[in-house]
């Protein structure tokens, strides 16, 4: 799906569910990480997360578009467009738009796990962050720590 297709989709959804035209720009924003989309108050444009389209398909994207169009049309009309406003929640129900988008399935960034062992008492420590073994000692017996295993 490219920029023209997303623009056309937003315009169609706006006419179909809201009965009003969408007169601004809709685009994908690759910098969005944790949100499905956002409505920009200054420019009245809508930005959408392309990864949601890749992961969940067109149905989820249409739901996100409906949610952002609720912000858009209420803001243009001068009514309550924020998530906590009654007008916004009522319009969400009327057009069957989701209040929140699905959670993004995170691509794990290779979680590193460091395992240290005390040379005196053999107590093992599992940490996500590397520690300076010259500076830190065992909390139980004050023995020297050594790195046993590093998994990534």
Swiss-Prot record:
Top-level taxonomy: Bacteria, Bacillati, Bacillota, Bacilli, Bacillales
Location, primary (coarse class): cytoplasm
SMART domains linked to this entry: SprT
Protein name: Protein SprT-like
InterPro entries: SprT-like_domain (IPR006640), SprT_Zn_ribbon (IPR035240), Uncharacterised_SprT-like (IPR023524)
Co-factor requirement: Zn(2+)
GO MF annotation terms: zinc ion binding
GO cellular component: cytoplasm
Swiss-Prot/TrEMBL keywords: Cytoplasm, Metal-binding, Zinc
Family the entry assigns: Belongs to the SprT family.
NCBIfam families: PRK04351.1
Binding sites annotated in the UniProt record for Zn(2+): 67, 71
Cofactor binding annotation: Binds 1 zinc ion.
Pfam family, one: SprT-like
Organism: Bacillus cereus (strain AH187)
GO biological process per UniProt: response to stress
Protein localization: Cytoplasm
Active site, per annotation: 68
Domain SprT-like, chain residue ranges per copy: 7-148
